[in-house]
Amino acid sequence: MSQTPFQRFPSRCIARRDAVKIIAGASAAIALSPSMALADSIEEDAQADQTLMNSWRYDQGELIEDEATEEDGISTYGSGSAFGKDAEGNWCNSQGNPIPGALLRGVDVSEHQGVIDWRTVKNSGSIDYAIIRCGFGSNYSNQDDKQFFNNVRGCLDNGIPFGIYLYSYACSTSMARSEAQHVLRLLDKAGLSPLSLNYPVYLDLEQQDKSGKPSGINDKGQSIALSNSALADITAAFCSTVEAIGYAAGVYANTNWWTNFLTGSTYNKWSKWVAQYNTVCTYSGIYDMWQASSKAQVPGIGGNVDINFDFLGIGGNHVWSRIFGQDQLDTMRSIAQTGWSSSSTVVVATQNTYWDALTASALAGIHDCPILLTSSSSLSTQTKSIISQLGATTAYVVGGPIAIASAVDEQIKNTGCGKVIRVYGDDQQGTARAIAEQVVNAAAPDTCIIATSWKFQDALSVAPYAYWKKAPIYLCDDGSNKLSAETEKAIKAGGYKSAIIVGGPIAVDSGVEARLENCGIPSVKRIYGETEYETSAAIADWETKCGMSVNKMALATGNTYYDALAGGALCGRNGSVLVIEKNSNRTAITNFIAPRKSEISSGYVFGGPIAVSSESWLTLLRTQTGRI
């Protein structure tokens, strides 16, 4: 995934106890500096104190071990519960009964555990992930967790996937944003980025007043009661701040809080971590991780530690994994590295427009090679490195010197790729025809594809089929959405037996069917839906009927084209489909993936959480695991 060694295409999701984790094409050009500049400005006003922690877990900053009550939704385990696996490989509770749906087991840790021997933890095989406390309250250095950096380094050095949590004192949205900046400051200081975390950044909500109701601590150290709406606003302020930088966000609370105070459906767009020390979690709402006990024993960790179960496989890539990088070109490189260890040929297209890369899908299919993106003026660093890594000796550059400068040809040769072939026409339709001619001469395909040139979504969805079937894509003219005389002539010369039109009559003129029949094509089929997102699902459904698979399929954003341009080639090579989504239209997940989830043993999400949001990622994982 362009990602950390642990997480593949991160996902983020979980929170924590003591106080209280998938970029690209727009993939996620993550501009760290503006927000980090804020995070670096440590507040020096009034500061809270760890002794102000009061909750079902803390009494004036001290951990409470045995005094939880049933009213809190907590029933404590006996000391030393094992939580191991049974003979069938199922995670079990303290009574040895399987925990339905539990995929991964982890711990959450803070300075309360002292210095942890992470190598011993790793070698014990006791856990799959860790959630690390970074601190508590607003952005003050004396509220940093004393073991945060040691714990991060221990996880990094030993390949343990991890996420972050912060114990909240916030009683206002401004304080919540300060708490988010507290997290961001420490992540930046630790040298971490959204690519580093396998799990989300969690807000730990448990601070309460003497009556047991939710509260915050103001800058005078006073306890302030919080209404349900205030809690929702505080949570949104914190989560939106960390999400703006590209991190996934989550919320931690016990069942009492989730049932009575954190009740709105808006919380479902973040990873939900539920604490209930019981043999089962009885919370009836959606949740992704369960904190089952505070009394587990793990080799390498002195004393008791919280044990948690991940039901989505967020850090373990159980089915879906993200492929992404710091920006769209990093994502493109990661996609190429995922699909190819070597390739004698590459196709290079500009990242500045989508037509050339899309219509090059069949050409890439002919040569079983990746599609690489570059800037127009010079060869991108990422494409340069991947050409060298793959050992390519031939590069097809699609697009003329306006699309990609002539100097790029020589830059490609300097990578060791000695043969550069330019394929282009006078405009995007002409380049599509030139590419199609190459494909026809090499493979004599029996099918061609017709798409609009004024938007990219329809052709994105059919690109894997074009690669797999080696079916050329022809573009309609701008404005009219009709086929030009030159394109009709090229189609007729292709000798196709069938043609596929992607998009409705607004995208591709209703008269195009007749024009294709006049070109001698006996079978013409149009595929479309109400919007481009329904069209995407319809195309994928049709592709499966043609023999393509949903296993190893991919999901990408429909807001931009970068990730799917490169990803379409990977899907085509795998013989799998690609669907697109956006936050306001997840038809691809709900209508296409959901009924086919049993057929999917692995799948990809192209792009990080700025491209395919954390909410969409959670919806996908919850759909796959039946937890929605």
Regions found by a protein language model. Name each.
Residues E111-V115, G135-Y140, S168-S174, Q207-S211, ...:
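Solvent-exposed loop/turn segments at secondary-structure junctions
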Residues G125-A130, N158-G163, L192-P200, E243-G250, ...:
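Loop/turn elements at helix/coil->beta-strand transitions in domains of secreted/extracellular proteins
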Residues M1-I14, I23-P34, D40:
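N-terminal secretory signal peptides
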Residues R16, G316-I628:
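Extracellular glycan-binding segments that recognize GlcNAc-based cell-wall polysaccharides
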Residues S41-Q113, S124, S265-V319:
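Functionally critical loop-and-helix segments that line ligand-binding/catalytic clefts
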Residues P194-Y283:
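Catalytic domains of cell-wall/extracellular-matrix polysaccharide-remodeling enzymes
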Residues W91, G96-T235, T415-G418, V423:
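Substrate-binding cleft of extracellular glycoside hydrolase catalytic domains
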Residues R105-D108, D128-R133, P161-L166, Y199-L205, ...:
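Structural recognition of the beta-strand scaffold that forms the well-ordered cores
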